[in-house]
Amino acid sequence: MAEASAASERLPASRMTSQYCTFCQLVAGNLPMRKVYEDDEILVFHNQLNWVPVMLLIIPKVHMTQEEVWQSGDLLGRMGQKAVELGDEHCPRGYRVLANFGADAVQSQHHGHLHVIGGVHLGLYVRNPLEY
């Protein structure tokens, strides 16, 4: 827990939450969500998208970029542990834990996060690269 606290101490107050960030609004309780888990540092909820039966999002409660999350050390480790725990619970036949970085990866939220997806055979990661 100290890692997220340390991360929040390094960020200016304006970066701790963002009024324009959907995920910050969820953390603040200003938007509805189907919460799965919450502690002092992370929040897990069902994605509104339903491309596959299980689509969970794991976010830090402090507004951080994807890069900041992945460089956070203990916080990323805790998020990863929770991803595995919930993946095992919700998708006993298998799941993916992933993160998108930037436009080509179709990152739609600038608040860093992990995805846990599954509940169905997921197939290949991408189309055959030779088709591009």
Which positions does each model-derived feature cover?
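HIT superfamily nucleotide-processing domains
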Residues: M1-Y132
